[in-house]
Design a protein with these regions (language model features):
Chain B
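A cross-kingdom marker for long, charged
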Residues: 204-243
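Leu/Val/Ala/Ile-rich N-terminal alpha-helices, chiefly Sec-type signal peptides and the beginnings
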Residues: 21-125, 194, 205, 230
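Sec-dependent N-terminal signal peptides of Gram-positive bacterial secreted proteins and lipoproteins
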Residues: 1-21
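Extended amphipathic alpha-helical interaction segments
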Residues: 93-204, 238
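Solvent-exposed, well-ordered amphipathic alpha-helical segments
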Residues: 45, 52, 59, 150, ...
């Protein structure tokens, strides 16, 4: 959470862009990562991330603090935007048929080659999971969100999220094993 | 992918810089270089003729580019203080054009190796001298065209100060005063940074430093306007209808 | 690296700073409408009454000012246009345009081959523009491309 976040949110709800700016600066990278892991392409991730924050700013007047972090609200918007993104594409994407270049990730350009290759394999495998599994992996294992917050974002009970993350990791491991063979 | 649409003014500004890059029919293509290679296959005299022709055209284009920059520079509307800076930059562009003239004179009597040496020297000279000069001219043009923004911002600040004072007398919230104080600091910062940019031109500081100062001053202005917007939002909630 | 270690690496992915800056600017340029609050609590209702009272008082000031009921010297003439969002927006946009222009440095325009401006529209990253602009806009065929003066000099030095 950002220092003085509650005051910033209150001011942002009142329409003060000078308050929304710091919120954007703080949360944009994590929303970008969440989206990028799901969609794989930097340009798409940038477009969707932009839409997330635009939607957040346009609707900030209706935001009400209910004991959950501001980031939860942003993640929920991001999940919806990714769904809309795929709907707009209007086609079933078969991973086998995709040009590997589609998944080239300039965002990982600063990693060493072997790490980049490993990450790309894992990212492709994550992209093959169902959306809920993708979400729980990003939220719990990449962003280290507490169980309570992840449950709020995913609109599930904490128990359901615990079960889901276990299944998601198992499924991911199975897919990576399949890739290897 | 989204992109920003800029009004024609931006196009005119960038167009003037890009026109300098390919002024007055100065379009050199990769096939021009290929033609030199092809001429080499026909013999030394053919190659020499091709090299001299392309080198002459290239240096003439470089001179035309400098001339175009100078024309744009002299077309800027500047205050008396800024005329000194403009004159300095214009003189340096004259020096550049004189240099190109001297190099052009050498081309006619040069052999193949001679043309290669001239090309190499002009390339190196541009890297060490001309490119910095062109960058500084671009910076100065940008700076001159930004000056009215500072005047407008100051006028805006004065108007906002009036309305905030008026509302305070009528019992309005203190947060208006806090936002106004921030705006005042930001506008002052912007003006100080703008002055530093002017001094950077006078002191012939490196173009990247000058550009950084210009960028900082514009960012401070932009931040001041965020505060104006915040004040506007509060005032609009206090005054439900526009008079 | 095991799977969990690899997943942790994803946390180091960062968005492109130029995109972040442009996106931020575009988003903050949008002006949201002030919220209409649904007043349920007594506290909010009371605050609304106070605000309404202040608004009535201020409106009264304006009416009296306009009708000249006050002697002029004590009060500064107030221009509502000082905080008019439309004019603020126009001025802020002019500044944002200059910032964008400042970001297109001479070094960028020096290294690209074929930056074109069409009807005053800036084509984002000039490097991107030069690689994606249709060749028709450059007036060249697929086989040739326009080169810079420096590129020509380099070619001739060999």
């Amino acid at each position: 959470m950002l220092d003085g976040e509650q005051k910033l949110i209150k001011d942002a709800v009142q329409g003060k862009s000078s308050a929304f700016g710091p919120l954007y600066d703080h949360y944009q990278p994590m929303i970008y990562r969440f989206v990028f892991v799901k969609v794989g392409r930097r340009e798409d991730a940038e477009d969707i991330t932009h839409q997330v924050f635009l939607a957040a700013w346009q609707n900030i007047g209706s935001y009400k603090h209910r004991g959950h972090p501001f980031s939860s609200w942003l993640y929920q918007i991001a999940r919806n935007q990714v769904v809309d993104h795929y709907r707009a594409k209007k086609s079933e994407i078969s991973l086998e048929k995709m040009d590997p270049e589609y998944f080239v990730a300039p965002a990982t350009a600063h990693f060493d080659l072997s790490t980049k290759l490993e990450m790309e394999k894992v990212r492709v495998a994550i992209a093959g999971l169902k959306p809920d599994y993708q979400d729980v992996i990003v939220l719990r294992f990449i962003e280290d969100l507490p169980l309570k917050e992840a449950a709020h974002v995913l609109e599930k009970s904490e128990g359901a999220v615990k079960l889901m993350q276990h299944r998601a990791i198992k499924e991911l491991q199975r897919m990576l094993e399949q890739q290897k063979n | 992918m989204f992109f920003l649409l800029l009004p024609p003014l931006a196009g005119i500004f960038l167009g003037s810089v890009n026109t300098a890059r390919a002024a007055d029919n100065c379009v050199i293509t990769s096939s021009d270089l290929d033609a030199v290679t092809a001429a080499a296959a026909q013999g030394l005299m053919a190659e020499l003729a091709a090299r001299r022709a392309l080198l002459t055209r290239t240096i003439a284009c470089a001179k035309a580019e400098a001339q175009s920059l100078q024309n744009n520079l002299n077309g800027l509307s500047v205050s008396d203080d800024e005329k000194t800076i403009r004159a300095q930059l214009s003189d340096r562009l004259n020096d550049a054009m004189n240099y190109y003239d001297l190099e052009l004179e050498k081309v006619g009597g040069a052999g193949i190796t001679g043309t290669q040496i001239i090309a190499k020297e002009v390339f190196a000279w541009r890297g060490n001298n001309y490119n910095f000069l062109a960058a500084q001219v671009a910076n100065f043009t940008l700076w001159v065209k930004s000056q009215n923004l500072f005047e407008t911002a100051l006028a805006r600040l004065r108007s906002v100060e009036s309305i905030v004072s008026f509302l305070e007398q009528a019992g309005a919230q203190n947060e208006l005063r806090s936002d106004l104080a921030s705006a005042q600091v930001l506008v002052q910062d912007a003006r100080n940074e703008n002055d530093s940019a002017r001094n950077a031109f006078l002191q012939s500081l490196p173009p990247d430093q000058t550009l950084a100062l210009i960028q900082q001053s514009l960012q401070s202005l932009s931040d001041a306007y965020q505060k104006f917007f915040d004040i506007s939002t509060v005032v609009q909630t206090l005054l439900p209808t526009k008079p | 690296m095991n799977l969990f270690q690899i997943l942790k690496q994803f946390k180091n992915i960062e968005p492109d700073p130029a995109f972040k800056e442009t996106s931020r600017r575009a988003i903050l340029a949008y002006r949201p409408v002030a919220p209409t609050t649904h007043l349920w609590s007594a506290q909010r209702t009371l605050w609304r009454i106070i605000e309404t009272g202040a608004a009535v008082a201020l409106t009264g000031f304006f009416v009296l000012l306009i009708t000249g009921a006050f002697s002029g010297s004590r009060f500064v003439p107030v221009q509502y246009s000082a905080v008019d969002p439309q004019s603020l927006h126009a001025e802020a946009q002019a500044i944002d345009i200059q910032i964008q222009l400042a970001n297109v440095t001479y070094a960028e325009s020096a290294v690209e081959s074929t930056v074109q401006t069409a009807g005053g529209k800036l084509l984002g990253n000039p490097k991107k523009a030069s690689s994606t602009a249709p060749s028709a806009a450059r007036g060249t065929t697929e086989a040739t491309s326009t080169i810079t003066i420096d590129q020509a000099l380099q070619g001739l030095s060999q």
